Amino acid sequence: PEGIFRALEMSRIPVSLDPFLPRALDRRWEGEYSGDDLPRLRAASPDGAVISVRVAFTLARGPLGEIRWQAEIEGETDQVCQRCLQPMRWHFRLQPDIALIRPDDRPSALGEDAERLELGADGLLWPAAAVEDEILLALPLAPRHEQCSAGGHREFEPGEGDREAENPFAVLGQLRGKS
């Protein structure tokens, strides 16, 4: 007999799935993606970047009856350090927990700031696209090595422009005193 805890079935990640089917709920999906599977991430990475992503997710019913995509996304990709302009590896670990919304649904019970993913017109979840969205949202705007020797030197030497400028309103004060 099953207890109150239901064992999660584990499966490979499909290309697409209907998250609202009962058989999709409470099942653990696992797999890996490369740059070939994530074209937008490949485009946002330097040429020849090595992209490896490991994903595990479940579809579960939330407290308000909504279907939630709960994922663990871990991986790494090449980036260019914006301080020294040398290649670097960017490691990431993401744990999105997002309500899935049908195209014709607008559940107000979730609240305005609840994170949600509106599914396409077909009503299907495309896991690779959802994973790619999360990685692109987490991608650093200006990636940098943690210990980067660049940036410690001054590009310009102190010069004439660094001296303290005279107050332009001092002349007005002098004129006011004369009247």
Protein language model annotation of sequence segments:
Residues Q86:
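Short Cys/His-based metal-binding microdomains
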Residues V80-R83, Q147:
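The −1 position to Zn-ligating cysteines in a subset of zinc-ribbon hairpins
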Residues Y33-D36, R83, E112-A114, G120:
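Residue-level signal for pocket-adjacent positions within structured domains
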Residues P1-R28, S52, R89-S179:
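Charge-rich, low-complexity linker and terminal segments
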Residues E2-D78:
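A positional/architectural concept
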